[in-house]
């Protein structure tokens, strides 16, 4: 990962760590990744990608549907969870996003951790709820 991402900021690299973990675990290479300025992204895509809101509510509004996750893979380590998921629309089960996330469970409410472990609701939805 380091060679491919040498021109990307350390902050972006840290966001890619969960994805890199699962790709490495499966002996797969990450797809080509580059950073671009948000002004170079077309309007519709920019509204979906370049914002300060949570991604779950942004995608839910755009697709006019609640979302759920399909967990493709996960890894627990003490109170830290890495998971790779597909977000899907509840109204037709179509995928709208693929991604991986790291979640520090130690500071979260027990009922929220239980829902995270069930693996059905996106983290953004749970953060709204709790």
Model-found features: residue ranges?
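N-terminal domain-onset segments
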Residues: 1-82, 86-130
């Amino acid at each position: 990962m380091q060679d491919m991402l040498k021109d990307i900021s350390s902050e972006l690299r840290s966001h890619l760590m969960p994805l890199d973990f699962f790709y490495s675990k499966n002996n797969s290479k990450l797809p080509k990744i580059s950073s671009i300025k948000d002004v170079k992204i077309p309007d519709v895509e920019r509204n979906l990608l370049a914002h300060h809101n949570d991604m779950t509510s942004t995608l839910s509004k755009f697709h006019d549907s609640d979302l759920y996750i399909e967990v493709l893979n996960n890894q627990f380590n003490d109170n830290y969870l890495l998971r790779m998921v597909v977000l899907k629309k509840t109204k037709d089960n179509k995928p709208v996003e693929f991604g991986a996330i790291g979640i520090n469970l130690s500071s979260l409410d027990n009922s929220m951790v239980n829902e995270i472990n069930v693996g059905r609701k996106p983290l953004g939805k749970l953060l709204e709820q709790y």
